[in-house]
């Protein structure tokens, strides 16, 4: 008979646990109590792919879809709370949310196919921490916040503070995003999200731009936020682009300054989907177009 192998023995794979708590506190306890690799499952559209390609091998998966507060969209005094496990397709079915934040809803409805949208959530898209995530520039432009639950209680942070780099977040051990908060819209406000992709649909953004703005009664821009995706290590807020709009009537000159500021903020990479130079140019073009779309909505036209 052949001699037994003499090399180092291969460690046995640990058995993966699957838990489905029904309260946030129970979910946090599970996340905080596991010493090894833990993942939260909301929609699973990113996690399951990562597991199948051996990019992650969790010892514990915590399914949060059975927590009622994470499965609902609630409106109060014009603001919205979106549970972390609410699927993108459900956002489009919420009339009040769609009317108040059409750019955010449009961005969510660009996450993959219709089948993916029936599972993928805004919180999952945010915590996956892809620089090219479609919903994140729209959320950042909207001034959205994330409610984080953890062993030390809850805290609320701007959504742009979650991702720290590709696939990396600022969440501490035992923490999870419980909900996304969208503020009340002032009158004469509008938002929009646009992206460039090589194909007509179901592709990753080469560049994504979210714009949110508010006008006064005379049509002067009083507030604006501009966010860019896929042009840096994470989605970025561009204050200089917003400054190009604030305090003036938005005309061709203001839009040119906006486009220039957006392009100047880019720190992209070269890859098979686009060169640095291409992304920088497209960012300016999309910023202008997204601002024009947001402006039309703010004017009610």
Identify the function of each model-found stretch.
Residues 5-301:
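C-terminal structural segment of proteins
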């Amino acid at each position: 008979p052949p001699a037994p192998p003499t090399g180092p023995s291969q460690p046995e794979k640990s058995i993966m646990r699957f838990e489905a708590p029904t309260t946030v506190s129970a979910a946090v306890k599970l996340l905080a109590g596991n010493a090894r690799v833990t993942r939260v499952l909301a929609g699973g559209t990113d996690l399951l792919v990562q597991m199948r390609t051996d990019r992650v091998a969790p010892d514990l998966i915590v399914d949060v879809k059975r927590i009622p507060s994470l499965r609902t969209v609630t409106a109060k005094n014009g603001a919205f709370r979106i549970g972390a496990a609410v699927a993108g397709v459900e956002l489009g079915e919420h009339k009040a949310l769609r009317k108040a934040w059409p750019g955010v809803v449009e961005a969510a409805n660009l996450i993959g196919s219709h089948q993916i949208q029936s599972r993928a959530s805004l919180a999952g898209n945010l915590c996956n921490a892809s620089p090219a995530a479609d919903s994140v520039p729209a959320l950042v432009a909207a001034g959205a916040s994330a409610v984080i639950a953890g062993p030390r209680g809850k805290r609320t942070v701007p959504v742009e503070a979650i991702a720290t780099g590709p696939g990396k977040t600022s969440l501490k051990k035992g923490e999870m995003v419980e909900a996304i908060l969208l503020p009340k819209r002032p009158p004469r406000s509008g938002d929009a999200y646009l992206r460039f992709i090589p194909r007509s649909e179901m592709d990753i953004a080469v560049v994504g731009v979210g714009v949110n703005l508010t006008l006064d009664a005379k049509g002067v821009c009083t507030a604006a936020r501009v966010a860019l995706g896929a042009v840096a290590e994470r989605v970025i807020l561009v204050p200089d682009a917003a400054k190009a709009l604030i305090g003036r009537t938005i005309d061709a000159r203001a839009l040119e300054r906006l486009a220039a500021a957006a392009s100047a903020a880019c720190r992209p990479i070269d890859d098979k989907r686009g060169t640095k130079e291409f992304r920088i140019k497209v960012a300016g073009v999309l910023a202008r177009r997204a601002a024009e779309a947001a402006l039309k909505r703010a004017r009610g036209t």
